[in-house]
Amino acid sequence: LWNYAILPMGETPEKDDGQILVPFAVESSLSGVGKRLGDRNELWYNRTFTVSPKWNGKRVLLHFGAVDWKADVWVNGVCVGTHTGGFTPFEFDITAALKKGDNELKVRVWDPTDAGCQPRGKQVNRPEGIWYTPVSGIWQTVWLEAVPQQYIRNIRTTPDLDRKLFRVETAACGAQPGDVIEVRLYDNGTKVAEGRALSGAPVE
């Protein structure tokens, strides 16, 4: 359970309204709240968490599966990032904001629903005909991940059947000039291809 508060835009909570079960939207009864947010209010979440001593020396990433719609995130009072968009996952490197013991996580969410210009599907503030309510706030899983100081953040693969090639593009964090990315392609445990390229360049 997380703590939550609903306040007019621009105001900061001095106390919580109650608790909310994440990752259910605040409008959902499954969240334990079942309240409408509206485009003139903001939804605040807060909770504490600890980081395992086994993660010392590693980078710590805070992942959100999805938050509808605009999210601002703080760890121990430090703004670690902002994300806009209700349907895509995102993460922030929160290593520099962490401390020993309890860490405080705060998330501020604004969701104008049909008062804004974002894609919203069937979500409307005043449903008629169908009773599909807005889906505001954290509605997918939130989790922490420990990664090495150098790690691959994302991989994009593109097969080229005409040229009999397999193109791999990587986004490496913490890579140094001259670092090499090496890719091996296996088919049922048998290596069928391999390639090397400098970090930032595609491997074919």
Go through each PLM region and give its residues.
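Ser/Thr- and Asn-enriched, surface-exposed coil loops between beta-strands
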Residues: 86, 158-164, 199-201
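Hydrophobic beta-strand residues in large extracellular and virion-surface proteins
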Residues: 20, 62, 105-107, 168, ...
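Accessory beta-strand-rich segments of carbohydrate-active enzymes
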Residues: 5-9, 35-152, 175, 188-192, ...
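Predominantly extracellular/luminal regions of secreted and cell-surface proteins
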Residues: 1-21
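Surface beta-strand/loop "capping" patches
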Residues: 146-176
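Solvent-exposed edge beta-strands and adjacent loop segments
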Residues: 21-30
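Generic beta-strand hydrophobic packing signal
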Residues: 1, 142, 155-157
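Beta-strand-rich binding/interaction modules
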Residues: 75, 165-198, 203-204
